Amino acid sequence: MNDYNHYFHFPREEWRKLEVSKDQILTAEELEEIRGLNDRISLQDISEIYLPLIKLIAIQYHEAIFIHGEKMEYLKKKESRAPFIIALAGSVAVGKSTTARVFKLMLDRWFSKTRQVELVTTDGFLFPNKVLEERGIMNKKGFPESYDRDRFAKFLTDLKTNKEAVEVPLYSHFTYDVLDETRMMHNPDIVIIEGINVLQADQHESLFPSDFFDFSVYMDAAEADIKKWYLERFFMLRETAFQDKSSYFHQYTKINKKEAETFALGVWDTINGVNLKENIEKTKYRADLVLHKGTDHLISDIYLRK
């Protein structure tokens, strides 16, 4: 399937008219703190796009809690509901990380911090660089085979079986590698899982990650636009984070701009662009909701599964 026949289509102007009882729940300063590099999200986007979306997620959350309560009462069981899991997928450089941080902060505010909301990135479930190098797939980092799917499946199972403490692996974009340390999550109510691979399915597995999700979102844009944003972000990082001598990518600050551009284009054409076409984009129609961005990096259309 490669169309939106099973989705309601909301152009931005229609979506923004959806009634939301709560006022703006983020300040300009807070948005600036969580905004990703080269992301053009504004308070207007928060009001017109994200506030109605957070209300929709809250409706889904309350519905899940109600159904669970009714089921437990009927079955005469006393088991608390597992965390409500929101999956957020999409290409590199499309704005997933910023959107995930916006989701977390806005859900915290929506529920007046009466619900524990956690954010997890699937980067932590990549195999360490050492393993990728041993297997000869360092140039496939981000592809399905570069992830520890067993570890990710255990993580999701632990969440959905109400394990009291769930281990979360950590990743550093600075060192470009999985960290040795982890963090623990304790009884979250809502978990946002962000990553390029969250909606991918391995046909050899008995369970798909999507089996564990309560709501899923795909960040979409034309490939030409994503490629442009990727290059813009690369050069912004080259002038900032890459300047640190400890950065994995520091070496690319020592070459001239043309050489750096050739390198970045090569990464896109042989890795990120290929992964988008072969693996990531195919998962779009598995999502409950698709947020489509225009050339200006702003969300222009929303597609909600019927």
UniProtKB/Swiss-Prot annotation:
One of its GO terms (cellular component) is cytoplasm. ATP binds at residues 90-97. Pathway: Cofactor biosynthesis; coenzyme A biosynthesis; CoA from (R)-pantothenate: step 1/5. Its EC number is 2.7.1.33. InterPro entries: P-loop_NTPase (IPR027417), PanK (IPR004566), PRK/URK (IPR006083). It comes from the Bacteria. The gene is coaA. It catalyses: (R)-pantothenate + ATP = (R)-4'-phosphopantothenate + ADP + H(+). The lineage of its organism: Bacteria, Bacillati, Bacillota, Bacilli, Bacillales. Gene3D superfamilies: P-loop containing nucleotide triphosphate hydrolases (3.40.50.300). Keywords: ATP-binding, Coenzyme A biosynthesis, Cytoplasm, Kinase, Nucleotide-binding, Transferase. This is Pantothenate kinase.
